[in-house]
Amino acid sequence: MYPYPNEIGRYGDFGGKFVPETLMQPLDEIQTAFKQIKDDPAFREEYYKLLKDYSGRPTALTYADRVTEYLGGAKIYLKREDLNHTGSHKINNALGQALLAKKMGKTKIIAETGAGQHGVAAATVAAKFGFSCTVFMGEEDVARQSLNVFRMKLLGAEVVPVTSGNGTLKDATNEAIRYWVQHCEDHFYMIGSVVGPHPYPQVVREFQKMIGEEAKDQLKRIEGTMPDKVVACVGGGSNAMGMFQAFLNEDVELIGAEAAGKGIDTPLHAATISKGTVGVIHGSLTYLIQDEFGQIIEPYSISAGLDYPGIGPEHAYLHKSGRVTYDSITDEEAVDALKLLSEKEGILPAIESAHALAKAFKLAKGMDRGQLILVCLSGRGDKDVNTLMNVLEEEVKAHV
């Protein structure tokens, strides 16, 4: 039986609750409320009804037959989280935490966002539940994800651009936590990934674990067996944790794909496992990208959802224990994988998801045709069209 987290929120050496005294009480309140609802049949019934009727679960498992044929190796299956309401896996967690907030009597939501997908999901569930919603987003991400910013505002959320640091996800998270410290009596902080202080990594994992559970059952029905390998992209790591959870006790190879940006031998990457060291970020002990003085080095990725300088503490444990292998994928490799899936399957994935696809495509080529790779397609790529147009401008112009 997989024993983590333990009673103090640790995953082996990692995790915990490294926060100012002012946050201990609100975190304890969330932990108590979460324990009460986690296995409560009435809560689970309400939650899964929302997932089915509002978000459209279960999501499909799609055999990528033309990509499989093109690569000539293992059969590639895609868990289609892009088909969720709002376009990614983020709605799974947002619905769960909104219900938790409701049970706690909170009616004001705070959220941070990078690619904007969690912000959109938070704004969506806030509208559904009649909550107010304030979303913190780095100004760099506001610029490159303008479509999602407009969506959040349409949904009634206030979007607060964060100008400190690099203007990306880390900075948005810092500001969201600062705001929560001052308003924790009536606000609920809806964190978007398996990061932060205990109990957040456990809460988010719980509200994402249906990804792997569904995929496992679907693949068994279709192929009659387990996958040989499971691949997911990793920033903070919530889609990966949701996918991996169902396979941790199975004889299945699990692989996380981090963002190598311009290359892990350059300063422009977000490869936390490959290049990071142990430290504390946003209340949790984990791996992070830092200098010799413990100062966080600003991460970089073409993907707004992966340029986070830390990683969820459970991923840190799974890396150290050897249970999960983590590799890094460059911007160029991710864009190439995105183009291949779009052209061969008619599916435009998010740039985040394209990191997982790139790793899966590399692996598939070296595997037998009878083997299976399961990939978490965490989101759709509509939000990335402006970025892609800039990156592929000359190529696109040639086709117009």
Swiss-Prot record:
It comes from Bacillus subtilis (strain 168). GO terms for molecular function: tryptophan synthase activity. It catalyses: (1S,2R)-1-C-(indol-3-yl)glycerol 3-phosphate + L-serine = D-glyceraldehyde 3-phosphate + L-tryptophan + H2O. The modification N6-(pyridoxal phosphate)lysine is found at residue 90. The gene is trpB. GO terms for cellular component: cytoplasm. This is Tryptophan synthase beta chain. HAMAP family: Trp_synth_beta. InterPro entries: Trp_synth_b_CS, Trp_synth_beta, Trp_synth_beta/beta-like, TrpB-like_PALP, TrpB-like_PALP_sf. Tetramer of two alpha and two beta chains. Keywords: Amino-acid biosynthesis, Aromatic amino acid biosynthesis, Lyase, Pyridoxal phosphate, Tryptophan biosynthesis. CDD domains: Trp-synth_B. Pathway: Amino-acid biosynthesis; L-tryptophan biosynthesis; L-tryptophan from chorismate: step 5/5. Belongs to the TrpB family. PROSITE patterns: TRP_SYNTHASE_BETA. Transmembrane segments: none annotated. Its cofactor is pyridoxal 5'-phosphate.
